[in-house]
Amino acid sequence: MAYCFKSNYTSDYNSGLRWHKRGIKKVSDSPGVREINMNLYDNKLYMEDINYVRSQNLPWGKLKNKSLLLSGATGMIGSFLVDVILEKNIIDGLNCTVYGLGRSEEKAKARFGKYADDPRFVFIPYDVKLPLKRNDLGTVDYVLHLASNTHPMQYSTDPIGTITTNIIGLQNMLDFAVEHHATRFAFASSNEVYGENRGDVEFFEEGYCGYINSNTLRAGYPESKRCGEALCQAYKAQKGLDIVIPRLTRTYGPTMLMSDTKAISQFIKKGIAGEDVVLKSAGNQYYSYQYVADSVAGVLTVLLCGESGEAYNIADENSDIMLRDLAAIIAKMNGKEVIFEIPDALEAAGYSTATKARLNGRKLRDLGWSSQYNIQCGIERTITILRSLQ
């Protein structure tokens, strides 16, 4: 049963991040930035979330004195995962070096200023659509490809970038993993690979294949994720690369980007602002959701415990909900109402056409993972934490 996790954990560590580029000012040297940067780490609920994942019963020894490289380090999943590993280093002596890849130096400085002087964290400015040639890194033990265009507006405004990040970007990361003799490669895939429910199942298991109309703009994201999974299997067969595939469902949490245009993110932003929640459909969509802490725990479980070549759904039915009910929960929390609005053509072009996408998480639970935050608790924590940063 999912529940709202409680802990008395706090962290007093106050360090910071070295940059793989000469001449970049540390975040502590930038007036007005450090206060914003430190707010998240000063939040008790956020540090409880980090501690919950840090304390998972996982074979952490596989990461001890090793190195981990991940793309999308400043994204919702990536930034949370970076915090978990670096706190694990500090508290439990994991001594895992993290190489974080991301396009925005400024975003990384604002997000990871706490680790500015930590030799076990290196941020590398990088666009995954370009080959990653870094001979100075030596052997990299684990590689995670998390970078992706993950919200609807990007699907319609940058359809080329959406596809190339998921295919060319993935290939660049796979090549890097092969060249640097990585022990394991994890490709963060998506619930969207399942397409539309044919009406024959209640939950998607990992072998399910639903309908996707490939001759549409919106098909770029799910089809490129499908292609990415096949590309991983090709590298496993031809290059001998050990790969695993965590399939993320609709993830939310306090590390979400304010630019995110997914429905749940829009609802949460309205909740933070204390405004009415805007629903741009009848709200009949029935989806799986997952709080970011549980999603990252799932990614780490797949990375450290998953069987080579296998895909795993990161989902729990206690967080499955219809979109209209999700909107109502957030509105009720803030004493507001749900109002209906017709989306413009650009917005509508990026929306998923799937009306029912519930994932079966049994395969991942068999590895020992379980969800700790149900949808009500996760939403409450997200809004509370993000409000504290205002």
Name the predicted role of every residue range.
Residues 190, 229-254, 265:
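Conserved beta-loop-beta element that borders a ligand/cofactor-binding pocket
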Residues 198, 226, 251-266, 275, ...:
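Glycine/proline-rich active-site loop of Rossmann-fold NAD(P)-dependent oxidoreductases
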Residues 172-220:
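Conserved Rossmann-fold NAD(P)-dependent oxidoreductase catalytic core, especially the SDR/UDP-sugar
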Residues 292, 324, 347-370:
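Conserved C-terminal active-site "lid" loop/helix of NAD(P)H-dependent oxidoreductases
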Residues 125-165:
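NAD(P)H-binding glycine-rich loop region in Rossmannoid oxidoreductase-like domains
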Residues 161-169, 215, 219, 223-224:
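Glycine-rich NAD(P)-binding loop of the Rossmann-fold in SDR/ketoreductase-type enzymes
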Residues 34-142:
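N-terminal Rossmann/SDR dinucleotide-binding element
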Residues 305-348:
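Mid/C-terminal beta-alpha module of Rossmann-like enzyme folds, strongest
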